[in-house]
Amino acid sequence: MLNKEEIIVPKNLEEEMKESYLRYSMSVIISRALPDVRDGLKPSQRRILYAMKQLNLTPGAKHRKCAKICGDTSGDYHPHGEAVIYPTLVRMAQDWAMRYPLVDGQGNFGSIDGDPAAAMRYTEARLTHSSIFLLEDLDKDTVDMVPNYDETKYEPVVFPSKFPNLLCNGSSGIAVGMATNIPPHNLGELIEATLLVLANPQTSIEEILEVMPGPDFPTGGIICGTEGIRSTYYTGRGKLRLRARIHVEENSDKQRENIILTEMPYNVNKSRLVEQIAELINEKTLTGISDVRDESDKDGIRVVLELKKGESSEVIINRLYKFTDVQVTFGANMLALDKNLPRTMSIHRMISAWIRHRMDVIRRRTRYELNKAETRAHILEGFLKALSCMDEVVKTIRESSNKEHAKQQLVELFGFSEAQSLAILELRLYQLTGLEIDKVQKEYNELLEKIAYYRRVLAEEELVKDIIREELQELHKVHKTPRRTTIEMDAGDVRDIEDIIADESVIITISGDDYVKRMPVKVFREQKRGGQGVTGFDMKKGSDFLKAVYSASTKDYLLIFTNMGQCYWLKVWQLPEGERRAKGKPIINFLEGIRPGEQVAAVLNVKRFEQGEYLLLATKKGVVKKVSLDAFGSPRKKGIRALEIDDGDELIAARHIVNDEEKVMLFTRLGMAVRFPHDKVRPMGRAARGVRGVSLKNEEDFVVSCQVVTDDQSVLVVCDNGFGKRSLVCDFRETNRGSVGVRSILINQRNGDVLGAISVTDFDSILLMSAQGQAIRINMQDVRVMGRATQGVRLVNLREGDTLVAMEKLSVNTESGETEESVSIQVGHAVEE
């Protein structure tokens, strides 16, 4: 029979299910699956760490059984069963899952191969220094405490969190209708980013990217491209493409290669990956691999793929990226609880939320310290007052009937507060000595200073920020670690296509209007010496002319430098293939991000970006810079800054330095030349400005040519009026870098100014082109070597009023007379390569 007080309320089933499911959803979102933006922890993680703190499991304490930790957590704070709590504890101890583990485990806590941890009765754990930083000052009323599930104890709503743990360790979880997947970051970089936002709340995400370029996963690996990082940081959502770290080694027989995997993408099971590769080999999806084995040990990961003889490691690596978890996608979703509401946040908003939390913690801690200091100062004031009339105080106490009567007498006769009276009654006799009185006075004075400081902190926001800044800087100094994950520019879109591109020799032509094309070498048929040749570029089309010719392979890189100091990458196979008479297409069509007024100034053909080789860049005003070639080894679609250009200056040349014997020669418009060893120019970073290469005679003078030469070569200097001179390199006295140099050719009315200079041999030909379209090709065997001080000889008879505007070197095959490649070009007083 129903109780009279019970009331039955009829309710629509559909409405009840909606309300119940909504309550369940919010419970999962807030109390289970999503981390708090302030300390980066879910409730289960927070309760485990708090239970460990209550057990006093500090980094210096002995490890305790995980069964004890899980039991206390379950019994006191998290009533979900020990078997549910233990996996959370285990994950916080795994250094391949957490960038900065919060639990120091002892025993078998699993492996990157997916092996399970030992049972909790066998394993032991304690807190790490990272978790201590999260818990620090918890006992100073810095955060709210709430009753536990059965209201027998109190637990913190959030930890004080001395560092932004959510971004340091990341988080993942699936709630109802939403999920979070936050990547981990490097603590040192994150602190630098946080300091930027702390100093200037309007800090842009671009500025954050400069100090924190992207996530840093505990397993290392490689992030391909920055587009996913930028999307994640700006919008809170993005896709990061992660790759294993791979290198290639020669097999012991030196006839085959081995592909070695030394770091896994985040959350990839190594053992499962090895099985996956083996299965694909058996299915013939992956060909060219003879054996796969896991040689990992205590020193690190090492998965070896032995290739069959003659197989290309690059092609197989690309197939691994395509078909296996050697390359995976990390779907970042920066979703966290902010003020108890789930929000998808940008990197700036997430850092700002932690700063707000930390400022609140500092204020609450300061208020706690202030109250403590004021309470103690109040007691010390009573001591000092009592010590000043100690005889009367002692007499009053002796005449009192009991402690309560003595306390009442002290309050009534001397004006002490109850707290002061109790403290006086508890004084020991030795504290009445002169030395102890001095100590009391000193302590009181120190407390007054602290109280004044605490009040300033509570009144001034900037002082709170200063405290946070000092704490972060101390953490940065002590706990900064190198990045594990490297970020490489995305060349993956090119790789898959390149595998099917034939590796063949081609001829590349660039016109004066920067039209480019490529042609197979076979279209230039071999001829005997003295043949008429074939047309490789139609010189009759408008006013355009052939500016440069290169011999290259379809899989080579072209480094394209502009007059504004930018460098762009192109693969040779990306250039349009054209017929011999075709003009080609504008090269700027293939360069993303090129700015108005930016023109091609130099082009280099590079097969490999080798260490120990350099690029030499030269500007019109005589600035030179040497950069390691491997600094350009990470292609970027929108180019990079190769040289910082001064106002009014421009890049005119880029040269490839391959050995120590090569010298640098700079030629100026007014006939001066300087020669010096390239080691006089120290290697610099890509964004550096460079150093002085030559001092110009006056404001009308400028550099027209930069050459990299050896002492056994000769150089041809050509003037506007068709005159020139070929001299030995050794005839040009070596001078210091930055000097005015020596005369290269006499500048007078007959010769005109210097058009350019090119290093040549007897087997080279020079193509000279004039403003009126006249062109002549001169064999260098017909131009004798002359002394440096001579005026030179006539190279070409120009029509009246005509002048030379361009010169080009063509290397000639002495057996066939066939033009093979062009090394250098001067056009309108700018150097092309």
UniProtKB/Swiss-Prot annotation:
Pfam family, one: DNA_topoisoIV
Additional information: Few gyrases are as efficient as E.coli at forming negative supercoils. Not all organisms have 2 type II topoisomerases; in organisms with a single type II topoisomerase this enzyme also has to decatenate newly replicated chromosomes.
Transmembrane parts of this sequence: none
UniProt-listed NCBIfam families: gyrA, PRK05560.1, PRK05561.1
Gene (name only): gyrA
One GO BP annotation of this record: DNA topological change
Family stated for the protein in its record: Belongs to the type II topoisomerase GyrA/ParC subunit family.
Record's keyword terms, sorted: ATP-binding, Cytoplasm, DNA-binding, Isomerase, Nucleotide-binding, Topoisomerase
Motif stretch (GyrA-box): 527-533
Assembly and interaction partners: Heterotetramer, composed of two GyrA and two GyrB chains. In the heterotetramer, GyrA contains the active site tyrosine that forms a transient covalent intermediate with DNA, while GyrB binds cofactors and catalyzes ATP hydrolysis.
Gene3D superfamilies in alphabetical order: 3.30.1360.40, DNA gyrase/topoisomerase IV, subunit A, C-terminal (2.120.10.90), Topoisomerase II, domain 5 (3.90.199.10), Topoisomerase, domain 3 (1.10.268.10)
Function: A type II topoisomerase that negatively supercoils closed circular double-stranded (ds) DNA in an ATP-dependent manner to modulate DNA topology and maintain chromosomes in an underwound state. Negative supercoiling favors strand separation, and DNA replication, transcription, recombination and repair, all of which involve strand separation. Also able to catalyze the interconversion of other topological isomers of dsDNA rings, including catenanes and knotted rings. Type II topoisomerases break and join 2 DNA strands simultaneously in an ATP-dependent manner.
Subcellular location: Cytoplasm
Protein known as: DNA gyrase subunit A
GO molecular function annotations of the record: ATP binding; DNA binding; DNA negative supercoiling activity
Catalytic center residues: 122
Top enzyme category: isomerase
Reaction catalysis annotation: ATP-dependent breakage, passage and rejoining of double-stranded DNA
Chain ranges of the Topo IIA-type catalytic domain: 34-500
GO CC terms of this entry: chromosome; cytoplasm; DNA topoisomerase type II (double strand cut, ATP-hydrolyzing) complex
